[in-house]
Design a protein with these regions (language model features):
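Basic, low-complexity terminal or inter-domain segments flanking catalytic cores
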Residues: 1-168
Length: 168
């Protein structure tokens, strides 16, 4: 699902905002991307539903062909309709009241094999870090989320000192 005319602009935007980084010709998601996806799944599931996006694409095509008024489409999207009362305005109101930033920015990795405590990656204002109990370590910028395993997190947490962990 996606409009070909907006593809390059979307790719540019997600790179600019830090949701992905470029490695060679590949776009690799960052921890910020995982937080954004978690927020969307938990609070805006209807907007990322495949059927909804497909129907919206069809309506956008109708606007492009002059078969539907763009103001009507925007009004219905934002305020909802009589058949479907929850528009974006209501979704945003609920998300503002219900969203827990600490939960959205926390990603479970596993359990520390020695202490039995949970190991989580948190996305904070200064970047991602791994945490277990009272110990945390910054995650190096070059480390992709799929490289964060329980073994790697344990090595980082058990290493002496602070700062970002760097591989040997």
């Amino acid at each position: 699902i996606g409009r070909p005319s907006t593809y390059s602009k979307i790719m540019e935007r997600i790179s600019e905002t830090g949701y992905v980084r470029t490695v060679g010709r590949a776009l690799v998601p960052t921890w910020y991307a995982f937080s954004a996806i978690k927020l969307l799944k938990e609070h805006f599931a209807s907007l990322i539903d495949l059927e909804f996006t497909s129907q919206l694409e069809a309506r956008l095509d109708d606007v492009a062909r002059g078969l539907c008024d763009q103001q009507t489409l925007l009004r219905e999207f934002y305020f909802g309709t009589q058949a479907q009362t929850n528009g974006l305005q209501e979704l945003l109101r609920c998300a503002i009241n219900d969203a827990d930033g600490a939960n959205i920015n926390c990603h479970r990795i596993g359990t520390h094999p020695t202490t039995g405590e949970g190991i989580n990656v948190h996305v904070g204002p200064f970047g991602p870090y791994v945490r277990s109990g009272d110990t945390n370590r910054r995650i190096a910028k070059f480390m992709a989320p799929d490289e964060m395993t329980v073994d790697r997190a344990t090595a980082m947490l058990d290493a002496p000192g602070g700062g970002a962990w760097k591989p040997q």
